Amino acid sequence: MKFFYSFFCSLFACLCFCFPSLMSANEVNLQNVFANRLKSPNHKISVINENNVFSLCYKKTKAIELSFNNFNGTSQNAQFVFLRKLNENYRMKTGKRAVCMNEANEYKAQISDNLAVVLRIYNDGIAFRYEYNHLSNGIVPQETTAFKILEGMKRWMQQWADSYEGFFPISDTYKQTPVPSYSGTSKSKDGWNNRWGFPALVQADENVFALITEANIERRQSAACLFNEGEIFRVVPDKNEKAGNGPWHSPWRVVILGTLADVVESTLVTDVCEPAKIQNTDWIQPGVVSWVYWAYNHGSNDINIIKRYVDMAVRLKLPYVLIDAEWDQMKDGFSVEDAVRYANDNHIKPMIWYNSSVGWVDGAPTPKFKLNKPEDREKEFAWCEKIGVAGVKIDFFSGDNQMNMDYCIDLMEDAAKHHLFVNFHGATVPRGWQRTYPNLMSTEGVYGAEWYNNVPTFTKKAAAHNATLPFTRNVIGPMDYTPCAFSDSQHPHITSKAHELALTVLFESALQHLADRPESFYQQPVEVQQFLGYLPAAWDDTKLINGYPGQFVTIARKSDDKWFVAGINGTDNPMDIKLDLKKIVKGKKTVKLFLDNPDNNEQWLFKTVELKELPAVMNCVPRGGFLLVIS
């Protein structure tokens, strides 16, 4: 263990808070440690070794502490050596950017004959993983990677639940009461929650933030979460039952670092992932989806309700419809094949729902046990392809253990053989699979609009929560929040209409499910209906214009020659949001504005202006929003 102590205390210092001097408390004296400095290609991020502690710094600002120790092995002093420079571009079918740049300096520390640590320093963060030449008896050595998040530092962290459907409340302390409804919560001897899910956002300084997560889960690996003891937050992988023998490496531990724009715009989670394993991806087409479940929880066993949602997709010019749970119990002598045929006859591509049958089984919706065995899965996916199903939504998993991770990979790979999209629900958050398996279009792992069906809690929390997600959950991958609730479900919403419409751009998901019922969309002005018909679900570029978690956010996304700019007010008070678009768009452009009517929240305001006439400030009503289309 001693070898790890020396090295990991070293790595701890480089990613740790830089030490005080005559400068401000959050600045580091780079002169004293320059000789031990590892850096990013643009030199903005540095990993600094001082006294066997590693510190992660953005420019001159200390960010967050990181420590590694207590691994099985012998002790020796380890030093990082430069290995190579990564500089490549890769394309994504989905996500915040079509062409991503994978640029980093890679370093390696050989800890023993059996173990090395690979560290990559990117322009927007760092990533590291452990690489073993062989495992002993198939046992993965215990990992105790730990981050130090000081009391008083602002943080937005989600208490762990196996569905990752929780809030990211702002706090400056780890002392938070466990949420009793979460499955898998844990508490310390003092009674505070001590288990946290990825991602975790921490504010290190006024303009410096760090987002902690992980990426590139492969077979023989489990996903991880954070357990804390006071200020120390340890990375703890879930059960890893069958790691096998031979070479093994951990997933990448990732820290995205910089300004809020650096965090929101980062593709670091997919940068470290394996390239696409699907060669022909022409059949993978992101799009907007009409969705039965939000308004009719048991509506997918009624062909007449399904037909209404197909007709809605036709009228709004949406490419997809989702037939949700219980389609195998279709009423009145009909079958799901009848529903699928109706959709395809109307040139709408249908997707259907499955229970994963590894999580909620007893009393859970059907169909169940169709996908667990390879031979059953092959039969089911072949049948889906034959009858004209475009994709599958698979629900109710049971945590982050290796069994679930392997199962998810099996599902993505086998679905791709039959040209089926995949959308995971009741599952873990994205960890970069969308690059390796481009048919993974979206993942739930979010407290979304579905919760208007379940509890009254969401009504008052939704606006602030919506203004937090772009800085936390949606940074790491697609998010099937299911926006656009213009009407009410079991519990009311108090966000404005423009707020709800803005979410369709603000939240990135390659399958953008629209929550509301057909009649609600038909009641909206023609401008809104037409917009939904040309709304993209994947983007060429993404830029954060401004914002702060939980308060407000404005994001611009590009598709072809259009920019879509969405902003929301997460507070209960009116807010003026500055709108400076000079860095993203210039010249003679036309702007369509979708706005709230400040005199009547039930009405819209629409304007079309030249770009040069665009107001410098958007006046938002409480929990309001706005949307611009620039062409």
Which residues fall in each region the model found?
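C-terminal beta-strand-rich structural cap/linker in extracellular carbohydrate-active enzymes
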Residues: T608-S631
